[in-house]
UniProtKB/Swiss-Prot annotation:
Pfam families: Prenyltransf. The active site is at D18, N66 (proton acceptor). It comes from the Bacteria. PANTHER family: DEHYDRODOLICHYL DIPHOSPHATE SYNTHASE 2, DEHYDRODOLICHYL DIPHOSPHATE SYNTHASE FAMILY MEMBER. This is Isoprenyl transferase. It comes from Agrobacterium fabrum (strain C58 / ATCC 33970) (Agrobacterium tumefaciens (strain C58)). Binds 2 magnesium ions per subunit. The keyword Coiled coil does not apply. Signal peptide: none annotated.
Length: 247
């Protein structure tokens, strides 16, 4: 467990799970083996997040750009998602974990969409941890869909353009009702957001770790939380102002 105080635990942690393919390549294995080992890292991280009192854990599972990958790899990823939900949903429900899905569901195959909806519906009343799965997700697409929704309301007279605020835009995003991420972790040593939670990351702390996702374990997660606790979050203010506000 992290050695930080409860007040230093982030409410919302988001993770870009990167490096499955490179993990497999290093070991002379097919890429799908990296993805399979990555599922084990997901299970371990979800348990760790629940154990240390995090309220929201968002995992970037499949981006809207991932459809460009070889058809065989996409098929493997879809199969792993279905297997994860079928195998783990009952346990997540028993552990009081709520599942939410963000991303564009239009165009998904019926069986995938039905499984995602089943996971949300079964766990809707759970309160310990909200596990947010970003699937067929791209932040630019999310923002485009949100602003198009607002534009339609303005065009049809339901909304004044003068009434548009950052809070309104946030309410139209897939993450509506969720706090912005306090901490965004990316594995594999890459240092970029890759079209993930661009709007929501305005004041997030970032941690880029060298481990490939299949090697990211419980202790590495706790270490990330401890590193977060050392950060000085100012939200655009001076350090002195933050200190006074927290006094």
């Amino acid at each position: 467990m992290p050695t930080t105080t409860r007040s230093s635990i982030p409410e919302h942690v988001a993770i870009i799970m990167d490096g499955n393919g490179r993990w497999a390549k290093q070991r002379g294995l097919p890429r799908v083996m990296g993805h399979r080992r990555g599922v084990e890292a997901v299970r371990e991280t979800v348990r760790a997040a629940g154990d240390c009192g995090i309220s929201y854990l968002t995992l970037f599972a499949f981006s809207s750009e991932n459809w460009r990958r070889p058809e065989s790899e996409v098929s493997d990823l879809m199969g792993l998602l279905k297997a994860f939900i079928r195998r783990d949903l009952a346990e997540l429900h028993r552990e009081n974990v709520r599942v939410r899905i963000i991303g564009d569901r239009q165009g998904l195959k019926t069986d995938i969409r039905s499984l995602l909806e089943e996971a949300e519906q079964m766990t809707a009343g759970n309160t310990k941890l909200t596990l947010v799965i970003a699937f067929n997700y791209g932040s630019r697409d999310e923002i485009t869909r949100a602003t198009a929704s607002i534009a339609r309301d303005v065009a049809e007279g339901r909304l004044s353009a003068d009434a548009i605020t950052p809070e309104m835009i946030s309410s139209r995003l897939d993450t509506s009702g969720m706090p912005d991420p306090d901490l965004i972790i990316r594995t594999s040593g890459e240092e970029r957001l890759s079209n993930f939670l661009l709007w929501q990351a305005a004041y997030s702390e970032f941690l880029f770790v060298p481990e490939y996702w299949p090697d990211f374990d419980r202790q590495r997660f706790f270490s990330a939380i401890e590193q977060y606790a050392t950060r000085d979050r100012r939200f655009g203010a001076l350090a002195e102002q933050v200190a006074v506000a927290g006094a």
